[in-house]
Amino acid sequence: SRAVADSWMDEVIKLCGRELVRAQIAICGKSTWSKRSLSQEDAPQTPRPVAEIVPSFINKDTETINMMSEFVANLPQELKLTLSEMQPALPQLQQYVPVLKDSSLLFEEFKKLIRNRQSEAADSSPSELKYLGLDTHSRKKRQLYSALANKCCHVGCTKRSLARFC
């Protein structure tokens, strides 16, 4: 089955305009589906909301930092000095332990910050996007796709090369 998928992706097509766009949509749908089916079971999974995912990471980080700070606190003084020379970031991490213990409060602030940034992004004018350097990346990506579209139209291209833009 994998060999069939690879040969399908290496097939050369010569399309222009709407036909190229339709092929791009079909390729992206099939390549995304095949990647998912190779990496996961075929059973569809419902995506978990961000509110469920982020706290688990915060809790894991909190547990790790708490464990490290307790471990370091119980070390003899000579080893603490050696450890701080080898791991200068550890004292910096320890300053965040009290903050991370209130991770639910921190997460609420984090969600507010995300909402504010999203509303600011919606209100941003193109000149502000240019100032932030956000327009350059998308322009380069469009130029690359335009060059590929010209190649697909005049010479032909593989489905794999189109799948890179999914």
Curated annotation (Swiss-Prot):
InterPro entries, sorted: Insulin-like (IPR016179), Insulin-like_sf (IPR036438), Insulin_CS (IPR022353), Insulin_family (IPR022352), Relaxin (IPR022421), Repro_Hormone_Insulin-like (IPR051042)
A single cellular component GO annotation: extracellular region
Tissue specificity note: Expressed in the corpus luteum of pregnancy and in the placenta.
Family the entry assigns: Belongs to the insulin family.
Signal peptide segment: 1-5
Subunit structure: Heterodimer of a B chain and an A chain linked by two disulfide bonds.
Maturation propeptide residues: 37-138
GO MF term set: hormone activity
Membrane-spanning parts: none
UniProt xrefs under CDD domains: IlGF_relaxin_like
Predominant place of localization: secreted
Keyword Disulfide bond annotated: yes
Keywords recorded for this protein, A-Z: Cleavage on pair of basic residues, Disulfide bond, Hormone, Secreted, Signal
Described function: Relaxin is an ovarian hormone that acts with estrogen to produce dilatation of the birth canal in many mammals. May be involved in remodeling of connective tissues during pregnancy, promoting growth of pubic ligaments and ripening of the cervix.
PANTHER family from the UniProt entry: PRORELAXIN H2, RELAXIN
Pfam hit, one: Insulin
Cellular compartments annotated: Secreted
Domain of life: Eukaryota
Protein name: Prorelaxin H2
Gene3D superfamilies for the chain: Insulin-like
SUPFAM superfamilies: Insulin-like
